[in-house]
Amino acid sequence: MSNKYNNLLKEVAAKYASIILNDAKIKSLTSINSAEYLYDSFVEISKLPLEKKLPLKWKLITVKENICTKTNLTTAASNMLKDYNSPFDASIVESLKKAGGIILGKTNMDEFAMGVKSENNLFGRTVNPVVKDSNYDVGGSSGGAAAAIAADICYASVGSDTGGSIRLPAAYVGCVGFKPSFGRISRYGMLAFANSFDTVGIAANNVKGVTKVFNVLDHPDINDSTCLTKEARYFVKEQHKKLSRKPIKIGIPIDWNVSETHPNVLDKWNEFISLLKSNGYLVQEIQLPISLYANSVYSTMAYAEATSNLAKYNTIAFGNCLDEKFEEEIISSTARSFFLGDEVKKRLLLGAYSLARMNSSDLFSKARYVRRAIQLEFNKNFFLPSFSVDDPRGDIDFIVTPSFFNSSQPIETPSSYSHLSDTMLVPANMAGIPSVSIPFGTLNNGLPMGIQIMAQYLNDEDLLSFAGQFA
């Protein structure tokens, strides 16, 4: 073995040992590829021609447990899929590998991405690595992804964001979490929760790292019909060039200054607004009153979509099996009760209730109407057009809010409180617009403060460029 590869082997072994040690307490990883696999990947990449562009060369990347990989089980953190081995890599995993990235392993999550605490019956709970005694909530559902970044386990982590899933944990641990516009990144190979809300999410230590991964994943994919075509991307890019302008205007939604927000969070929000003004940005108050109903609409629509998406996990088409020999209907019902966790079962029941014939017109149909109203409300404030709505526009480039009402809470905090934790983040999923959570110092309790920045639909590049000035 040459000295070059001998030194590389030592580096991989040292890094591998460090990863195992760092993750022992926080439990951000559900599986990790072997040291031999990592070494072989490093060697394979090092043999490629120097002129070959590899933006993620030798970067260790983790992916969420609901993203398909051939080298690891893909369980969605559920006993229903605890032995599922995907025969293919998700499109995003293929893209990461082609860019020189090395898949380190999979990260923990709430079962089927339903929850805000990153806990499940299969792998247990991920804890917040920024708290020394490790008894604080890391957020969810992509808590393992953010925790892996905060613990310096990987360069970047790719998860999902259905209602704040990557941004809330990122805010809780003090890293950057990004949800792109709906349709920018392929979801082929990502297990669905709610199709009209699901996006791929990216976490990294800074906006530069997030941007690098986003540029690798941001491309058309014929395997995902909701992924924007090459022609659509070109059209949007050209239109945005024609409409670009200065000075940049920042909108502050006064409706979001609600009583539930902790006073210290409000202080940090105002501090960030002052920073924007001192940097020469124009700041003005805007109104987004309908967006305050986003959480209620999300609960109705997302749970209904989940009811449909998870119907296939009946132990007959997909899913773990019971030993008992019953009729098919009994097998399916019994297995779902046995293998699915309480939070998933609760959401599926609520989704089924909103889709029932006697309720759908009052619940699901009205929720769709309110969702559209939220999209229009955002659109009328932004300067750039959304290309899906032909309505009067405003003059705002970016909207700035806190990422949460309050910081990470002790693990024993009641779940009824935790379910409000992503209220600030859900509206971006509702409207399909890009949103990034960036760290902004710490609160009086020593925990990280997160600031959310949102932009018009498909204006992802400008959003990341703007956010990169602060993180």
From Swiss-Prot:
Reactions mediated catalytically: L-glutamyl-tRNA(Gln) + L-glutamine + ATP + H2O = L-glutaminyl-tRNA(Gln) + L-glutamate + ADP + phosphate + H(+)
Location(s), subcellular: Mitochondrion
Enzyme class at the top of the EC tree: ligase
Keywords: ATP-binding, Ligase, Mitochondrion, Nucleotide-binding, Protein biosynthesis
GO molecular function: ATP binding; glutaminyl-tRNA synthase (glutamine-hydrolyzing) activity
Source species, domain of life: Eukaryota
Intrachain disulfide bonds: none
Record bears the keyword ATP-binding: yes
Gene Ontology CC, one term: cytoplasm
The protein's Enzyme Commission number: 6.3.5.7
Function: Allows the formation of correctly charged Gln-tRNA(Gln) through the transamidation of misacylated Glu-tRNA(Gln) in the mitochondria. The reaction takes place in the presence of glutamine and ATP through an activated gamma-phospho-Glu-tRNA(Gln).
Protein name: Glutamyl-tRNA(Gln) amidotransferase subunit A, mitochondrial
